[in-house]
Amino acid sequence: MTQLPYAVDAETPLNPAELNVLRAQYEKEGEMVGVQTKFNYAWGLVKSNVRADQHLGVMLLSEIFRTSPERRRECLYYLALGNYKLGNYAQARKYNDALLENEPANLQAANLRALIDDKVTKEGLMGVAIISGVAVAAGVIGGVLLRNLGRKR
């Protein structure tokens, strides 16, 4: 991966002790969890390298985004980052573009856009290669079958 100035944030998880502090606070508050505590825990989860953590982080951020309009701006980048890390590039781009629409000079979001675009391009090329390979294989198999049918007659 090309290291962009803010890309380190996308790839640097909290250490387990730091994440455990956030988890403990979240669990301690229980049903009455505060928005800031929930956001902090979601932030730590999104930064994780564990897919289940990332998924939970995106879910918590989505809840904050829906229920706390005053916190939406804060959620946009981490929703974009979480979806990027989960491979949901269309969702990642949607959240990131919403942030860039309001903050066109946001370097973090601009760098995340570059990461998203790079992944989409690479996966698009991979998809084309896979489809091409399947088409070639189908053509070879079809040719062999037709040749064998011709010999039987």
Curated annotation (Swiss-Prot):
Keyword Transmembrane set for record: yes
Gene Ontology terms describing biological process: mitochondrial fission; peroxisome fission
Bilayer-spanning residue ranges: 125-145
GO cellular component, one term: peroxisomal membrane
Mitochondrial intermembrane-facing ranges: 146-153
CDD domains: Fis1
Subcellular location as annotated: Mitochondrion outer membrane
Family: Belongs to the FIS1 family.
Function field: Has a role in mitochondrial fission. Has a role in outer membrane fission but not matrix separation.
Protein name: Mitochondrial fission 1 protein
